[in-house]
Structure formats: structure tokens, C-alpha cells
């Protein structure tokens, strides 16, 4: 069974743990740097990206997260997690982890009161997935090697680049675990490649 970490500094941690377990993987709440060595994949949960960055810096997680990104193990960022994975952020000079060749705009769908749900078609996942958008970012631009998995209107809201997956919405806030299951499969495939 693969072991998937959920970065436990802030955000929808419990919900991700539940979704990972429902998808047939072991979930670990990552609160210490050394735990990164024990896991096969990592979820960066939604939350407040500025607060999350402050906590990442406070607990000296940034370099270990960048090292994890370079290790070939899959990472999945939802909402604020997408912001952490992006190489370019509109209105900001520097990236956070910067592992994905995507340009992201923060709070692109408006503030908390503008939160909404929308039925999405997601490549590799299926139709009618309810995307929960809460002060969500969206992907403005992608490099050629980034696969766009879903759009809401003309806005890119789910993307994949090799072992990295990112979504504007919160898949963990529904009882539909298909997006998490997709990530679990990515982790299983990556682990199999390592073994071979």
C-alpha cells in the first residue's frame, strides 16, 4: 500500500486524510521534515496561501519541499497548494516551491463570498465532478509539457505536469474521491517505476 503525506501545517488536512484513506492508500499527516522521507507522495492542501507560506518558513519546510519535488515523488496541490507549486504567480516576484511550469493568479474567482460549486469534466477522472471553489486561484498560462485536465468556462482549473498535479478547487470537500484516487494511482505508478 502506498503512503501519502498531507502537509499538516494549515488547511483542509483532515478532509484530505479521509479522502486518501477512502482511495485505498495510507495517509500520514506531515508535521516534521523527516516525515517526508517516509512517504511515496505528498498533498499540499488548500488553505490560506500567505499563512501557509509563513508556517512553511517558520518550520523551515521550504527547502525540504523543493528537494521532495526534485525526487520524482508525486505532489498534488489543491487551491493554495496549486499556488505553492506554480513557477510564476501574477503580481509576485518569486515562486514558492516552483515545481510546475504554470502561471497562476491568486483569488482569481473573487473573495470568500464569491465561493461556488461547479460541475467539471476532468480528463482521466470523469464527468460531473463537483468542484468546490473557495477564493480559488486559476491557471493563466501553461508550458507545452503541461496537460490541462479541466477548465471552468475558459479558465484552467486542473493541470498535470509529469508527477505534479494541481487543482484550483477542493476535491477533498466532497464525498467524491475520484480526483484523490487519480493522484493515488499516480503515486502507485511512480513507486512501481522506482522498483523496476
Swiss-Prot record:
Entry's EC annotation: 4.3.3.6, 3.5.1.2
Active site: 79 (nucleophile), 170 (charge relay system), 172 (charge relay system)
Keyword Mitochondrion part of the UniProt annotation: no
Single GO MF descriptor: glutaminase activity
UniProt record similarity statement: Belongs to the glutaminase PdxT/SNO family.
Catalysed reactions listed for this entry: aldehydo-D-ribose 5-phosphate + D-glyceraldehyde 3-phosphate + L-glutamine = pyridoxal 5'-phosphate + L-glutamate + phosphate + 3 H2O + H(+); L-glutamine + H2O = L-glutamate + NH4(+)
This protein's pathway: Cofactor biosynthesis; pyridoxal 5'-phosphate biosynthesis
InterPro entries: Class_I_gatase-like, PdxT/SNO, PdxT/SNO_CS
Organism from which the protein derives: Bacillus cereus (strain ATCC 14579 / DSM 31 / CCUG 7414 / JCM 2152 / NBRC 15305 / NCIMB 9373 / NCTC 2599 / NRRL B-3711)
Key word Lyase present: yes
Gene3D superfamilies: 3.40.50.880
Binding site for L-glutamine: 47-49, 106, 134-135
Record's protein name: Pyridoxal 5'-phosphate synthase subunit PdxT
Gene Ontology BP terms: glutamine catabolic process; pyridoxal phosphate biosynthetic process; pyridoxine metabolic process
Keywords annotated in UniProt: Glutamine amidotransferase, Hydrolase, Lyase, Pyridoxal phosphate
Subunit annotation: In the presence of PdxS, forms a dodecamer of heterodimers. Only shows activity in the heterodimer.
Pfam family, one: SNO
GO CC terms, sorted: cytosol; glutaminase complex
CDD domains, alphabetized: GATase1_PB
Amino acid at each position: 500500500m502506498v503512503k501519502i503525506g498531507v502537509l499538516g501545517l494549515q488547511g483542509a488536512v483532515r478532509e484530505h486524510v479521509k479522502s486518501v484513506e477512502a482511495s485505498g492508500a495510507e495517509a500520514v499527516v506531515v508535521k516534521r521534515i523527516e516525515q517526508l522521507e517516509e512517504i511515496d507522495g505528498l498533498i499540499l492542501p488548500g488553505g490560506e496561501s500567505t499563512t501557509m507560506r509563513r508556517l512553511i518558513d517558520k518550520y523551515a519546510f521550504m527547502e525540504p519541499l523543493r528537494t521532495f519535488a526534485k525526487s520524482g515523488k508525486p505532489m498534488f496541490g489543491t487551491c493554495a497548494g496549486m499556488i505553492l507549486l506554480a513557477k510564476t504567480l501574477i503580481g509576485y516576484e518569486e515562486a514558492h516551491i516552483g515545481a510546475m511550469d504554470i502561471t497562476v493568479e491568486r483569488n482569481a474567482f473573487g473573495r470568500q463570498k464569491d465561493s461556488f460549486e461547479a460541475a467539471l469534466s476532468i480528463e482521466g477522472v470523469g464527468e460531473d465532478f463537483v468542484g468546490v471553489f473557495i477564493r480559488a486561484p486559476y491557471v493563466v498560462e501553461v508550458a507545452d509539457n503541461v496537460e490541462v485536465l479541466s477548465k471552468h468556462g475558459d479558465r484552467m482549473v486542473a493541470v498535470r505536469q509529469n508527477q505534479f498535479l494541481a487543482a484550483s478547487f477542493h476535491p477533498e470537500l466532497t464525498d467524491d474521491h475520484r480526483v484523490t484516487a487519480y493522484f493515488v494511482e499516480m503515486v502507485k505508478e511512480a513507486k512501481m517505476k522506482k522498483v523496476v
